[in-house]
Regions:
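Hydrophobic alpha-helical membrane-insertion segments
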Residues: 44-57, 150
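Membrane-interface helix-entry/capping residues at the boundaries of transmembrane alpha-helices
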Residues: 36-40
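Extracellular/periplasmic helix-loop junction at the C-terminal end of a transmembrane helix
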Residues: 51-79
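Residue-level signal for discrete positions within transmembrane alpha-helices
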Residues: 1, 5, 41-44, 48
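Alpha-helical transmembrane segments of integral membrane proteins
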Residues: 2-35, 51, 64, 78-173
Length: 173
């Protein structure tokens, strides 16, 4: 049904946006550093791996071997909210992996652009630390583009969750 698909798409977009903000800001703060190289490599891999294959691998590893998540099925939100989150977490993580490549690049470039603005020089003159200035000013200025891209990707996810829903036996579209 559509509500399950929408819930999964919103959950996956929120996860992708949170992870991409952390990795994108860390990459932009030290271009060419370890975090930058690792995150760029991971986003290339995440974009290249088919979602249904990643779903099967994650299901075998995290659900069957480790038992962290249910292997398949869905618990309605009205019946058990915690069970619903638990049943949608692994599919949302798999869907988020496909979206991370674009979002990390968008966050990284937006933050790097914001770090070059003149108001960053003013924050140094005021005596603010780079981390404080980044959290206070840079994030506010640079998150509009990633949020816009995430909204567009969420619309794409609503139509593209069919294979993942089938692998995880979710009653979606």
């Amino acid at each position: 049904t559509l509500p399950v698909t929408l819930l999964l798409a919103v959950y996956a977009t929120a996860v992708a946006l949170a992870v991409s903000c952390v990795l994108g800001v860390a990459s932009a703060m030290r271009p060419g550093g370890v975090v930058d190289v690792v995150s760029r490599t991971l986003m290339q891999l995440a974009s290249a791996v088919p979602g249904f294959w990643l779903a099967v691998v994650c299901m075998l590893f995290f659900a069957a071997n480790l038992g962290w998540f249910p292997v398949s099925g869905y618990v309605p939100l009205t019946q058990d909210p915690a069970g619903c989150v638990r049943s949608l977490t692994l599919p949302a993580l798999v869907l988020a992996c496909g979206e991370l490549g674009v979002l990390i690049r968008t966050v990284r470039s937006s933050v790097m652009d914001a770090l070059q603005q003149e108001y960053m020089l003013a924050t140094q003159v005021k005596g603010l630390t780079r981390m404080h200035a980044t959290v206070t000013y840079v994030l506010r200025a640079s998150l509009s583009a990633p949020i816009t891209v995430a909204g567009i990707q969420m619309a794409k996810l609503v139509g593209g969750t069919g294979a993942i829903e089938r692998v995880f036996a979710l009653p979606g579209l």
